[in-house]
Amino acid sequence: MAHLIVTLLLLSVLTLATLDFTGAQAGVCYGRQGNGLPSPADVVSLCNRNNIRRMRIYDPDQPTLEALRGSNIELMLGVPNPDLENVAASQANADTWVQNNVRNYGNVKFRYIAVGNEVSPLNENSKYVPVLLNAMRNIQTAISGAGLGNQIKVSTAIETGLTTDTSPPSNGRFKDDVRQFIEPIINFLVTNRAPLLVNLYPYFAIANNADIKLEYALFTSSEVVVNDNGRGYRNLFDAILDATYSALEKASGSSLEIVVSESGWPSAGAGQLTSIDNARTYNNNLISHVKGGSPKRPSGPIETYVFALFDEDQKDPEIEKHFGLFSANMQPKYQISFN
């Protein structure tokens, strides 16, 4: 009996260690809107060589899903915005989508289904607002019907522009004109114990506000910049994240976790802010920082996906072409470590 107890304790310790290790891993966003990009099989090899254990893709690209078979890379799979109307229209359509893109790939480690990206009443994706929640519900029903409800969580990725009054972070709330949109989504996530996916970019905050110090955005400030009722903020990433947590709390979403589904820094495209040095500093500090928590949620880690794996020269505007960590020849644009 004593031997059995010792064995069980060792297994428990190993399991906890494994969970902590995987939880601390930053992933990458793998977009394909670029010329001359490597094959999906080569991309998977690149990720393995660089200790990248999580990936976000924005659509169910079959060659990519094939390349991920047996790879041990955990996947966030997107339902693209143009597909939302179809999967929202009927349960049968959603069942077919899940069968074709999830169930047919039983040896791919699906972690999340991101139903829609940056759908909002306030941007160019507003036409998808009426169908988003029903699309999420239908995909959830299909995932649950496949017996995968505990393994794969269904959510959607929002932009931080849905929040306001974000300084200090404890004042953060959702804008009045998005509450009717976001609150039913929050209720859905609470019911299904799924995280909210948030695309979080200190770069765009500082690009639109000259009063923000660069050190605060790059995680290099040596002192507290914002003091919020005893919580000290040395970086903008934590401030934006915790403002979003405050907004969730005010919308009956205090039980939710946030997964940062995109964050990155461009290396060119818009003047002095967009330099190789700034991109290297931000992304390396981001990967290190998210192994811990934020002032509001200090236990951490903060599951985060770095945008993006490659430059994508088919995207617009110009700034969107330059977020890549690697060049098309799979050489790092600058020194980057996921260890």
Swiss-Prot record:
**Where is it mostly found?**
secreted
Which superkingdom heads the taxonomic lineage of this protein's source? Eukaryota
Functional description taken from the UniProt entry: Implicated in the defense of plants against pathogens.
Could you tell me what this protein is called? Glucan endo-1,3-beta-glucosidase, acidic isoform PR-Q'
Q: Does the keyword Signal apply?
A: yes
* Induction cue: Accumulates following infection.
The UniProt family comment states:
Belongs to the glycosyl hydrolase 17 family.
- Residues the record lists as Pyrrolidone carboxylic acid modifications: Q25
- Could you mention a single GO BP entry for this protein? defense response
Q: Name one Pfam family in it.
A: Glyco_hydro_17
Q: Per the UniProt entry, what species is this protein from, by scientific name?
A: Nicotiana tabacum
Its Enzyme Commission number(s) read 3.2.1.39
Q: How is it modified after translation?
A: The N-terminus is blocked.
State the active site: E118, E262
Look up the signal peptide feature and give its range: 1-24
> Which GO-annotated molecular functions does the record name?
glucan endo-1,3-beta-D-glucosidase activity
Q: Which reaction does it catalyse?
A: Hydrolysis of (1->3)-beta-D-glucosidic linkages in (1->3)-beta-D-glucans
Which keywords are on file for this protein?
Apoplast, Glycosidase, Hydrolase, Plant defense, Pyrrolidone carboxylic acid, Secreted, Signal
Compartments, record wording? Secreted, Extracellular space, Apoplast
InterPro entries, from UniProt? Answer: Glyco_hydro_17 (IPR000490), Glyco_hydro_17_plant (IPR044965), Glycoside_hydrolase_SF (IPR017853)
Of the GO CC terms on this record, one is: apoplast
Has the keyword Secreted been applied to this entry? yes
